[in-house]
């Protein structure tokens, strides 16, 4: 894990964490597609990974998904966390969600194998609300957003291990998002080699839904 983080830092030397097709897109999504690099310490990243590993190991990697959005993945939802992990997740909630936003009670955990990827998709409003926030563990990756009506408008987020990304508003509903497969994993001219990636994702409640669980499977975030 530490090796992946050092590699990402070498790749990113002198680079921003977000790049886009033009200044208008960067300005439009400045507060709606956000990356906080180094949100987790190495110790916190290790804490989350150790807690998740036993539950993830019981599942096989899958190569199709109920909505065909993910390849090479295993996933789970987790409601019970250790005290140390609860402190971390509370920091995520404070950083990403407003005081008037309610969150889905289970946290979505998605484990991509090194060859795994998430295809371009727009999350259904039935499954989560206007904001999602994800912690990236183990491997650097590149998330790409593309406007659904004007595909020449795009944004790329560089997600190193220990980073937090936040998507809200227009970035959620007007842009598709994906995690690039290894052979396409570039951030500008910088190659970002993919390894196994775990994301820990908090989601706001869908509009008009009370506290609890979504009625259908979670989105591929």
From Swiss-Prot:
EC number: 1.14.11.-
GO terms classed as biological process: DNA damage response; fatty acid metabolic process; regulation of lipid storage; regulation of mitochondrial membrane permeability involved in programmed necrotic cell death
Binding site for 2-oxoglutarate: 165, 197-199, 203
Gene3D superfamilies, A to Z: Alpha-ketoglutarate-dependent dioxygenase AlkB-like
GO molecular function, one term: metal ion binding
Keyword Metal-binding found: yes
Keywords assigned: Dioxygenase, Iron, Metal-binding, Mitochondrion, Necrosis, Oxidoreductase, Transit peptide
Cellular component GO terms held in the UniProt record: mitochondrial matrix; mitochondrion
Pfam families: 2OG-FeII_Oxy_2
Disrupted gene: phenotype observed: Increased body weight and body fat, a phenotype amplified under high-fat diet.
Cofactor binding note: Binds 1 Fe(2+) ion per subunit.
Residues noted as binding Fe cation in the record, renumbered to the chain: 121, 123, 177
Expression (tissue specificity): Widely expressed.
Presence of the UniProt keyword Mitochondrion in the record: yes
Domain of life of the source: Eukaryota
Compartments where located: Mitochondrion matrix
Function according to Swiss-Prot or TrEMBL: May function as protein hydroxylase; can catalyze auto-hydroxylation at Leu-110 (in vitro), but this activity may be due to the absence of the true substrate. Required to induce programmed necrosis in response to DNA damage caused by cytotoxic alkylating agents. Acts by triggering the collapse of mitochondrial membrane potential and loss of mitochondrial function that leads to energy depletion and cell death. ALKBH7-mediated necrosis is probably required to prevent the accumulation of cells with DNA damage. Does not display DNA demethylase activity. Involved in fatty acid metabolism.
Protein name: Alpha-ketoglutarate-dependent dioxygenase alkB homolog 7, mitochondrial
């Amino acid at each position: 894990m530490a090796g992946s983080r050092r590699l990402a830092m070498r790749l990113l030397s002198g680079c921003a964490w977000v790049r886009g097709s033009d200044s208008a897109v960067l300005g439009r999504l400045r507060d709606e597609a956000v990356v906080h690099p180094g949100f987790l310490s190495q110790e916190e990243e290790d804490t989350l990974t150790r807690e998740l590993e036993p539950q993830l190991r019981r599942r096989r990697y899958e190569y199709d998904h109920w909505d065909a959005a993910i390849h090479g993945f295993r996933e789970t939802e987790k409601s019970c966390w250790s005290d140390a992990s609860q402190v971390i997740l509370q920091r995520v909630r404070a950083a990403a969600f407003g005081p008037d936003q309610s969150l889905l009670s289970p946290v979505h955990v998605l484990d991509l194998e090194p060859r795994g990827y998430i295809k371009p998709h727009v999350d259904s409003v039935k499954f989560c609300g206007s904001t999602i926030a994800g912690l990236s563990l183990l491997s650097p990756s590149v998330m790409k957003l593309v406007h659904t009506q004007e595909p020449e408008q795009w944004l790329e987020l560089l997600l190193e291990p220990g980073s937090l990304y936040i998507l809200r508003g227009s970035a959620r509903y007007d842009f598709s998002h994906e995690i690039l497969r290894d052979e396409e994993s570039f951030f500008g001219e910088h190659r970002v080699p993919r390894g196994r990636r775990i994301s820990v994702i908090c989601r706001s409640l869908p509009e008009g839904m009370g506290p609890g669980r979504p009625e259908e499977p979670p989105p591929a975030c």
